[in-house]
Amino acid sequence: MLELFFEYIFPLIIIALKVVAITTPLILCVAYLTYAERRVIGLMQLRRGPNVVGPFGLLQPIADAVKLLFKEPIIPTNSDKILFILAPMITFILSLIGWAVIPFAKGVVLADINVGVLYILAISSLSVYGIIIAGWASNSKYAFLGAIRSSAQMISYEVSMGLVIITVLLTTGTLNLSEIIEAQRTMPWWIDLMLLPMGVVFFISVLAETNRLPFDLPEAESELVAGYNVEYSSMGFALFFLGEYANMILVSAMTTTFFLGGYLPPFNISWLDCIPGFFWFVFKVGFLLFCFLWIRATLPRYRYDQLMRLGWKVFLPLTLFWVVLVSSVLVYTDNLPSI
């Protein structure tokens, strides 16, 4: 009996504890990211932002959560009720399970699988299904238009994201996220410089992937009232909200892993190795999240045709050209990694 426990049950308990250790701080970070967004945008617009609930408004996310929890969930009469309820749950769950392969520090990762890049690409592609299901199940023209926009936007920018990641794989020679970070430790400076434009393209693409300004066309308030979640209230709305902000943190972690060295110190400065890698990971992700908020506070929304033109006529040819350029340079300089 004891052997059965240690062989089958104990590993499951350890995995469950790891999942709780990752998801609990993540949900807290999502809650306080909403507070940070309101404070940052308030400061940029010369106002104070939330400052009443608790000291410096720090309890505002808790007040918002309690408010949404006790609101009445309203389900439209002619909607597909089962899909209507499932859609926000799908979006939120998918935003959490992507974290399974993200390395927070050296050796600190839930599942260090050899196809981590494929896993995270699959999860990020699936996240649009929750939005499409919500738009269809709501039986509302505004929600349906928002869902169609979201699927078109996802397809447009997923292609360029995939090509950008191919350039990273060409320089590192692995699909394992921990090994990608370790490869950046010894990567020549000129390869880093060559990947820099692709890092910018990747960050702009993930802005579109997460439906954030200036690419928030699926929920454009001036055109679609609130887009795909127009019929949602109470915890359905809260789960969509949490899913969006959890995706923001996830894509910031992806950008950090692929282009900023993950948990490595900036510019591989050796004397900074005394600081734990987790600190550098959080610092880099925090900087990218600030960029998300900064962009929302300063840039207007793109028109839909401009969004499509940028994805298909600018990013797709540029990333294709860059894949050919990077592979040619690596072959010519004999720096192509062995896989």
From Swiss-Prot:
Question: Which UniProt keyword terms apply here?
Answer: Cell inner membrane, Cell membrane, Membrane, NAD, Quinone, Translocase, Transmembrane, Transmembrane helix, Ubiquinone
Any one biological process term the GO annotation gives:
aerobic respiration
Q: What residue ranges are annotated as transmembrane?
A: 9-29, 50-70, 82-102, 115-135, 161-181, 187-207, 235-255, 275-295, 311-331
Tell me a Gene Ontology molecular-function term this record carries: NADH dehydrogenase activity
Enzyme class, UniProt record, top EC level: translocase
Known Pfam families for this protein?
A: NADHdh
Q: Name one GO cellular component term.
A: plasma membrane
Q: What membrane topology is annotated for this entry?
A: Multi-pass membrane protein
Where mainly found? membrane
User: Catalyzes what?
Assistant: a quinone + NADH + 5 H(+)(in) = a quinol + NAD(+) + 4 H(+)(out)
Give the UniProt subcellular location, in the record's own words: Cell inner membrane
EC number of the protein = 7.1.1.-
Keyword check for Protein biosynthesis: no
Q: What family is it from?
A: Belongs to the complex I subunit 1 family.
Q: What does this protein do?
A: NDH-1 shuttles electrons from NADH, via FMN and iron-sulfur (Fe-S) centers, to quinones in the respiratory chain. The immediate electron acceptor for the enzyme in this species is believed to be ubiquinone. Couples the redox reaction to proton translocation (for every two electrons transferred, four hydrogen ions are translocated across the cytoplasmic membrane), and thus conserves the redox energy in a proton gradient. This subunit may bind ubiquinone.
Outline the subunit composition.
Answer: NDH-1 is composed of 14 different subunits. Subunits NuoA, H, J, K, L, M, N constitute the membrane sector of the complex.
Q: What is this protein called?
A: NADH-quinone oxidoreductase subunit H
Q: Which organism is it from?
A: Rickettsia peacockii (strain Rustic)
